[in-house]
Amino acid sequence: MRLTVRLVDIAARGILLHHNDAKSLGVLAGDRIVISSPVTGKATVDYVETTGTLIDQGRIGVYHHTNEQLTLTENEVVEVRVADRPVSLDYIKKKMEGEKLTREDIRAIVADIVQDTLSPSEITAFVVSSYINQLDMDEIESLTRAMVETGDQLSFHAGPIVDKHSIGGVPGNKISLIVVPIIAASGLLIPKTSSRAITGAGGTADLMEVLAPVEFSASEVQEMTIKTGGVIVWGGATNIAPADDKIIIQEYPFKIDQIGQMIASVMAKKFAVGADVVAIDIPVGKYCKVHTIEEGKKLARQFIDLGERLNMRVECALTYGDAPVGRAIGPKLEIKEALSVLEGSDSPRSLIQKSCVIAGIALELAGKANRGEGANLALEILRSGKALKKFLDIIAVQGGTPDVSSEKITVGEHFYTVRADSTGYVIDLNNHSLITIARTAGAPADHGAGLYLHAKHGTSLSKGDPIFTIYADRKWRLEKAIEEARRLRPVMVEGMLIDRVPNVREWVPGRSRNLE
């Protein structure tokens, strides 16, 4: 069938057909068609949407994302035909039925995800089927390798190449801003690709973007790493393991965190950047992805097993996850706190200790320190000022201004301090609620938004003492965040007396006890 192009300014992928043309082709909404241009010779497969009013019969509406591949012009005539059904759908159905997928099955699924052959609903079917029928280690390895093969890779002549990762779930976990410069200052290479926040108040890429650009190609990442020893960039711009982002997008609405896919996601990125040694942070706590030490050890063994299959040395640290790391949550607040540590501040101790522990593991794995001595070496590098100098070098090589300090970072101009309404001790911090408040205040999109904790577990408070301060770039967002803070009450303060249980019976003076 020949149809005349009408370009539609919609960012999504897809094409729009009149009902009658769709009927003539024998397709329904959601089916695939092949569009080819006789002018350029380009062709692509995309999904059909139908209408009776938005497009005239004989015309085809081409969305922006689709036209990026075809470069069609308005009123150009194109050829349209029904596309073949992807064989990868059979493999997804196979997983739905509880069968084990082969390496070739998984390679076909991942290739179709990357090439946009599978629709979002079909990718969701793969995600859900892998969630219900868990991937085993063979499938996880196959998924990891397929993710790597379908994207760009880095290749360094010198080694060992170091990387680190945190599986997330803890607010304020800004340790990459300290770990990366410590590792790079030791003489090792660490090409750190990081994520943006999906449900959090700031991913590492969101934080680094306060100071420097974070979107680079894989070749640029490699070049900058060789020049300075390390980078902190957004992985989504590198085309490293591109299937991962497409899978994560489909996981998000269901709040699915499928363990096998998570392990493959992490390790694919590490393998693709050429990492020889990897330190993995697994926070453990009631508000974390991992709730118990036993669960954490099981997950760690899976990471280590996969590392051995991929010829990478992996070690995992089970870390305390029942409170934020440091006191700051939100891009500029966290950058300010990380810079203060790099500049020599002795607090917050949780941030310093965790950063040095993770950096220390990496230094030991890479042969820079004996076992058990890595954290001390990391602290020595931090205290010497070498890590700060290296961090400023990283900012510069990524196109930022290295003339920066913690004092120069300004946070949201609108703020409100939540205070204790009674005397007592902090007995609980709800990480989920703290993140919700920070996001309501505008983080991570508004870089100055977030919150700062004045009190953490065990802090003694008198009535009226500050518990945390909310910051926002916009007043209306601050007002919304205050409402959330009052509703959620994320910090629990209790005295030694939890409650009184009264005797509700009336007491009569002089009444004798019944001894019968």
Swiss-Prot record:
InterPro entries for the chain: AMP_phosphorylase, Glycosyl_Trfase_fam3, Glycosyl_Trfase_fam3_N_dom, Glycosyl_Trfase_fam3_N_dom_sf, Nuc_phospho_transferase, PYNP-like_C_sf, PYNP_C, Pyrmidine_PPase_CS
UniProt family annotation: Belongs to the thymidine/pyrimidine-nucleoside phosphorylase family. Type 2 subfamily.
GO terms classed as biological process: AMP catabolic process; pyrimidine deoxyribonucleoside metabolic process; pyrimidine nucleobase metabolic process
UniProt-listed HAMAP family: AMP_phosphorylase
Taxonomic lineage of the native organism: Archaea, Methanobacteriati, Methanobacteriota, Stenosarchaea group, Methanomicrobia
Function: Catalyzes the conversion of AMP and phosphate to adenine and ribose 1,5-bisphosphate (R15P). Exhibits phosphorylase activity toward CMP and UMP in addition to AMP. Functions in an archaeal AMP degradation pathway, together with R15P isomerase and RubisCO.
Stored Gene3D superfamilies: 1.20.970.50, 2.40.40.20, Nucleoside phosphorylase/phosphoribosyltransferase catalytic domain, Pyrimidine nucleoside phosphorylase-like, C-terminal domain
Active site (UniProt): 257 (proton donor)
PANTHER family: THYMIDINE PHOSPHORYLASE
EC number in record: 2.4.2.57
Stored Pfam families: Glycos_trans_3N, Glycos_transf_3, PYNP_C
Manganese keyword on record: no
Name of the protein this chain belongs to: AMP phosphorylase
GO-annotated cellular components: cytosol
TM annotation in the entry: none
Source organism of the structure: Methanospirillum hungatei JF-1 (strain ATCC 27890 / DSM 864 / NBRC 100397 / JF-1)
